[in-house]
């Protein structure tokens, strides 16, 4: 029941009105609805170990429905255009797209998605958010656009909660209300659909008409697609909300900030955003799998991630007199080499680990040896129990090398570090746990993908990805992740 509920909900939803969404097209270009050319979509279904009020059978049913809905919605992204009615200024060349939000009977289909205008809306939303990206905790455009779109489709103010984790948004569609379903005694069976919203500090060099208008910031990881897809799912759910109500079930929409290193999910979880839910479905994109395939993996799928910052202090001098310095640049070079040897020389080869340096900063003049150099990076582990030994080796090695060069070094674990966004609002950085997939749910996802798209569309992988999936929801549940290249 729950399964049906959730998956169904994803694909269809009710209100009794039309939704106008701004849509951007290149002149003379039509939206190729069947041509899907984007990154893989990771569907992560997570189940709480203690499923009160639910039998395992009910849980599997819910997951089945959720998976079916997500797989269908996946087809929409990557074809798209620009935008919704939100406060930020949108790029030029935008037209309105009408979405039929009238209640719809029966299980949703791809035909419904396209004929209702939802596909065009998702395309427009995705391109709009691509053109107006925001880095972690600065996702104001995506956040405000999501809220505006939810309101337009008929989600009441009482069922939308904003400002969670600075820019995070949580909304409710189905039986009960957002407030009532967050209570422990709620009888409404609720599932969470999650999308991340943040972009990366990367300069976009494409020539697409919806390229980033924010200098040095780009949606290079597909989170614009995730957010647009979640809004598309919301439209379907609203069209079929009466079915959810009849089943005493609901879907919670979880728009997460700061997946890229800021652990925005934790801020929402701490605010109670997933209280009362029994499962969560998450999407991610990646261009590595063949178009038209779904990649699955059992067990550990994504690594845990910890970030560190190093401050190396020495004594500056003129470039012509290096003997008068305690050169922090020379020390930094040796430290980077030493760090890169930690994995190959101190960790058992069968234990997957990656330590990478992401930045080095020091000096301002070509002829002056600086007093200080900073550098930082990430530690990625499939087995979190290795962290203490890796951290100890890292800190001791950095301190020893710095001392050998006459310098000192401070190594900072950034877990719990505070920061401010562009509007002066405070946020906190946290480490990410690994993602571990539940075999039973993975098998269910494979079954659904095969049923919907045919034999040969599921690629069962066995090599974990050392990238992390920044959602703190994961350590609370069993997990399921599927990659889909339909996007």
List the predicted regions and their residue ranges.
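Structural signal for hydrophobic packing residues in well-ordered secondary-structure cores
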Residues: 126, 133, 150, 154-155, ...
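Histidine/acidic-residue-rich, glycine-tolerant segments that coordinate divalent metal ions
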Residues: 169, 199-202, 206-218, 224-225, ...
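Acidic/His- and Gly-rich active-site-bordering loop/insert found
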Residues: 87-219, 228-249
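N-terminal signal peptide
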Residues: 75-92
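Classical eukaryotic N-terminal signal peptides for Sec-dependent ER targeting/secretion
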Residues: 1-9, 13, 24, 31-40, ...
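Metal-dependent amide/peptide-bond hydrolase catalytic core
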Residues: 87-102, 158, 330-487
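Divalent metal-coordination and catalytic microenvironments
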Residues: 129, 193, 223, 268, ...
């Amino acid at each position: 029941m729950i399964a049906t509920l959730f998956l169904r909900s994803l694909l269809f939803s009710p209100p009794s009105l039309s939704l106008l969404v701004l849509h951007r097209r290149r002149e003379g270009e039509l939206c190729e609805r069947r041509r899907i050319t984007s990154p893989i979509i990771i569907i992560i279904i997570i189940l709480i170990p203690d499923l009160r009020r639910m039998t395992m059978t009910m849980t599997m049913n819910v997951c089945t429905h959720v998976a079916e809905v997500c797989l269908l919605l996946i087809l929409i992204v990557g074809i798209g255009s620009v935008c919704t009615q939100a406060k930020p200024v949108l790029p030029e060349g935008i037209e309105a797209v009408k979405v039929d939000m009238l209640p719809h009977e029966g299980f949703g289909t791809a035909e419904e998605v396209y004929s209702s205008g939802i596909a065009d809306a998702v395309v427009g939303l995705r391109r709009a958010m691509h053109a107006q990206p925001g880095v972690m905790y600065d996702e104001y455009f995506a956040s405000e656009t999501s809220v505006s779109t939810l309101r337009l489709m008929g989600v009441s103010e009482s069922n939308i909660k904003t400002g969670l984790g600075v820019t995070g948004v949580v909304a409710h569609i189905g039986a009960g209300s957002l407030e009532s379903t967050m209570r422990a005694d709620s009888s409404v069976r609720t599932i969470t659909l999650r999308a991340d919203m943040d972009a990366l500090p990367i300069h976009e060099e494409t020539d697409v008409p919806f390229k980033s208008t924010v200098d040095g910031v780009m949606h290079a990881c597909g989170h614009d697609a995730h957010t647009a897809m979640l809004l598309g799912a919301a439209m379907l759910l609203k069209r079929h909300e009466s079915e959810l109500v009849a089943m005493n079930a609901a879907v919670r929409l979880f728009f997460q900030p700061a997946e890229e290193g800021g652990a925005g999910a934790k801020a929402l979880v701490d605010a109670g955003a997933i209280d009362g839910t029994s499962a969560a479905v998450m999407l991610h994109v990646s261009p590595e799998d063949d178009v038209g395939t779904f990649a699955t993996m059992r067990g550990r799928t994504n690594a845990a991630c910890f970030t560190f910052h190093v401050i190396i202090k020495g004594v500056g001098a003129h470039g012509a007199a290096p003997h008068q310095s305690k050169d922090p640049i020379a020390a930094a070079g040796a430290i980077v080499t030493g760090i890169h040897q930690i994995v190959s020389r101190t960790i058992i080869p069968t234990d997957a680990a990656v330590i990478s340096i992401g930045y080095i900063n020091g000096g301002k003049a070509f002829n002056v040896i600086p007093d200080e150099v900073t550098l930082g990076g990430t530690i990625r582990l499939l087995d979190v129990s290795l962290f203490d030994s890796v951290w100890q080796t890292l800190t001791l090695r950095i301190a020893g090398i710095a001392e050998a060069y006459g310098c000192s070094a401070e190594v900072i674990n950034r877990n719990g570090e505070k920061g401010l966004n562009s509007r002066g609002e405070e946020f906190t950085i946290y480490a990410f746990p690994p993602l571990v997939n539940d075999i039973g749910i993975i098998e269910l996802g494979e079954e659904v993908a095969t049923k919907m798209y045919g034999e040969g569309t599921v690629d069962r992988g066995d090599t974990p990805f050392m990238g992390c999936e920044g959602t703190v929801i994961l350590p609370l549940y069993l997990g399921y992740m599927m990659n889909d290249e339909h996007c």
